[in-house]
Amino acid sequence: VNGTRGSEVKIGNLQADGFGVFGNYSKETTTVYGNSLFDNQQVTYDNDKSKWTYSPLKFWPSDGHIDFLAYAPYDKSTKLTDGSKINNFAVSKVITDQKDLLWTNTTSSISADLTSTKENVNFHFYHALSRLGYTVKLSGNYLSKDVTFTLKKITLAGSPTDATKGAFYTSGTIDLSKQNKIGDLWSNQAGQQEFDWFSGEYIVKNSTKSHPDKVDNGNRDKSEDYLFVIPQNFSDTDGKGDKLYVIVEYDVTYNSGTKTTIHNKVYKQIKKNFEQGTAYMLNLTIGLPIEFDVDITSGVEGWGTDEEINIGSNDNNPWDGIESKK
């Protein structure tokens, strides 16, 4: 299944690239998916006619029904297995080559009124993957003449100490016959891979959420910088499940006085069940200031009670020497 590069499939993309249809004709009362009538038929949008078209045309049977499956964007090499499944959907390691994936299904038959000339199969597509995005900001607003924060790297991996350890599935099987939000859309998930989400130099200026674009040394513009991944549960409630960490590297450069740069690496385990058709935004905050605090009511330790030292008294601590002059 091919897809748009690093960006989601919206209606405009659907019109431009088209979608694929599988259709199985049956006289049985039960739903039977397959490709006896439509076998990965490409459907495209004709802007001049303002309608969806395909060729060669097929025609409604007078009885029975047709069970339809559809997906987008269209790929001429897509084939069905087990009646309704697409095997080995692969998630590219190259973010700009990743593929958003839509699917839908429906059962249709001609109406009882055979004089009708408008029998449309209405499709409503759903997103089959999880979408991840990110923003970055500072913990506060700091004077640039004093300090500069430079984002260097963002990695998603399966370990906080080994950024090469995989986390996300690399492939899986999608069943186009499944309904939306049931949770059984995917099977045979396999592989683990990490993502180098950002590598470069992006100056984070303030506490407003932002995203590096190409003009300011970003790898990709925000609209192209989504991850599309097979749904996966990283909740790790028992400590034995799949693990996901976001690892962020950034420089703090002190500009006043002797210019000094300190490299920082921070990480956080993301305990989340990434679900199909859901978009997630990782909002990253960097630059934890060193602040000082003294309690104005008790921040200075008192002297306590004076320790008495009695000298020259009658308690066995007489003067060491006595000198008298007349």
Question: Regions from the language model: what does each represent?
Answer:
Residues 1-326:
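Sec-type signal peptide cleavage vicinity
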